A protein has these predicted regions:
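Alpha-helical segment proximal to the catalytic Tyr-Lys
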Residues: 113, 155-157
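Conserved NAD(P)H cofactor-binding loop of Rossmann-fold oxidoreductase domains
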Residues: 76-81
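Conserved glycine-rich cofactor-binding loop
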Residues: 13-14
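C-terminal helical subdomain
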Residues: 160, 166-167, 186-227
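Residue(s) in the substrate-gating loop at a strand-loop-helix junction
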Residues: 127
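Substrate-binding pocket helix/loop in short-chain dehydrogenase/reductase
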Residues: 84-85, 92-94
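Active-site helix of classical SDR
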Residues: 108, 143
Length: 228
């Protein structure tokens, strides 16, 4: 898939998702943002709450109907709710898993039939905390460990028909950490990756020749402490 075509990007209104949408557009692709917020970029947008799986699936089908199919999907939407498991509001805990894991699966479920027609690709977004556990992050770790496992199983299931890449990024310079208690923010000396640089790796995965797969990408700064 050397040409990007129509690319669905969840979470494309901010952070990594916005950087991916911009990178896709700069390379001649057509990004379509699925997000609860409208992107400031002016890219085509579907209002979607990824916590509602059927809503997410319907949005994918609407995009495919408008564009005559889709060529790729990037599931960059992600949220967190920090704290000890007994202290986190259960509805907040459940929403983290719903958005990060179930939302990812919903996008894939709806997208795969279209991607199979064109040997398209899907890039799921996990985290280094999908490989390494951290206290006070049970919801996030559960969801991101789940994304890693889901992506590996999906790659087996769709082998030869759809390219599946799991991106495993470390901390990035986004609003993801805003609004947290200080104890849950990166330390002042933490070096975080610019999302634009991480987005370049997503485009790299999307543009591999047919038959060549980038199965997993661990992308961090050289001083990242969360992996290994």
């Amino acid at each position: 898939m050397s040409e990007l075509g129509t690319v669905i990007v969840t979470g494309g209104a901010s952070g990594l998702g916005a950087a991916v949408a911009q990178a896709v557009a700069e390379r001649g692709g057509t990004p379509v943002v699925l997000d609860i917020k409208a992107p400031s970029s002016g890219f085509e947008w579907e209002h979607v709450d990824l916590a509602h799986a059927r809503e997410a699936e319907a949005a994918v089908r609407r995009v495919a109907d408008r564009h005559g199919g889709i060529d790729a999907a990037v599931t960059a939407a992600g949220i967190d709710s920090c704290g000890r498991i007994e202290d986190v509001d259960p509805e907040h805990w459940d929403r983290v898993v719903a958005v990060n894991l179930v939302g990812t699966a919903a996008i894939a479920r709806a997208a795969v039939p279209y991607l199979e027609r064109c040997c398209g690709r899907i890039v799921t977004v996990a985290s280094t905390l999908g490989l390494r556990a951290l206290s006070d992050a049970t919801a996030y770790c559960a969801s991101k460990f789940g994304v890693v496992g889901f992506s590996r199983a999906l790659a087996v299931e769709t082998a030869g028909r759809v390219g599946v890449t799991c991106l495993i990024p470390g901390g990035m310079q986004t609003a993801f950490f805003d609004g947290r208690d200080e104890q849950y923010k990166p330390p002042p000396d933490a070096v975080l990756a610019p999302p634009e640089q991480v987005a370049e790796t997503v485009v790299f995965a999307l543009t591999r020749p047919n038959g060549t797969e980038v199965r997993e990408l661990i992308v961090t700064t050289s001083t990242e402490s969360s992996w290994p």
